[in-house]
Curated annotation (Swiss-Prot):
Gene source species: Natronomonas pharaonis (strain ATCC 35678 / DSM 2160 / CIP 103997 / JCM 8858 / NBRC 14720 / NCIMB 2260 / Gabara)
Family note: Belongs to the tRNA pseudouridine synthase TruA family.
Gene this chain is encoded by: truA
InterPro entries: PsdUridine_synth_cat_dom_sf (IPR020103), PsdUridine_synth_TruA (IPR001406), PsdUridine_synth_TruA_a/b_dom (IPR020097), PsdUridine_synth_TruA_C (IPR020095), TruA/RsuA/RluB/E/F_N (IPR020094)
Biological role stated in the UniProt entry: Formation of pseudouridine at positions 38, 39 and 40 in the anticodon stem and loop of transfer RNAs.
Protein name per its UniProtKB record: tRNA pseudouridine synthase A
Amino acid sequence: MRAFRIAYDGTGFRGFQRQPHGETVENALFEALSSLGVAFEDGRPPGYAAAGRTDAGVSARAQTVAFEAPAWLLPRALNGELPASVRAWAAADVGDAFHATHDATARAYRYFLYAPEPSADTTRARAACARLSGSHDFHNFTPDDRGTERTLSMRLRRQGPFLVVDCRAGGFARQLVRRLVAAVAAVARGERPLSFLGRALDDDPLSGADGIAAAPPEPLLLADVVYPGVEFTVDDRAAESARTVFATRRRQRLADARVAGALSPPE
């Protein structure tokens, strides 16, 4: 078995998990493996599992997949068949019993929240993160009916006009990070009092205008997945390919932002 670290720009995909309609990261990965002649059983490589399922528009730096891979399959070889927006960059040989989903002890997400001062208060945002950290039933922060009890930590730092929010837990329910960030943003902007978070963490469901909608997916990144005892070896050529591809995309988006800023008619 071999585990691979995968980075991808999720903006052009309908999520990570394979589906029959619409391009997903997993679809692209399986097509690449098929082109390379990797064996499949029941539509996937033997032993295949992934660390998590990111939603449409969400990106990743450390998505992790593992399966029975031939000895010659290095990240650089995988990149030769993957689209440019998906880059393998490290790998680790793991035991036959390794499972990329179940063996992960922690997952870390990072959200880049556009929240310039003074419209968003950093002190209020930090207080909101502290209130949401710990062990809670987050049933009001996810559409899931089960698996809503989680223990997590939230931290943030200001980076210019952005609040960078880091969320870490053993696992996350659907939309949990994005709804947590939306709640933090509402407190930071003065749209909700800090006491609202206590209500959101109570047993009673929130309804109507009190409901918490998910923040947009595009600013969210799966930053890390932790596997104790597993040491990933960076493929230098593959990592350089990833840096080049994503640096180019960054420059293009900076240019796109300048164009968007110039669209308003003159006053």
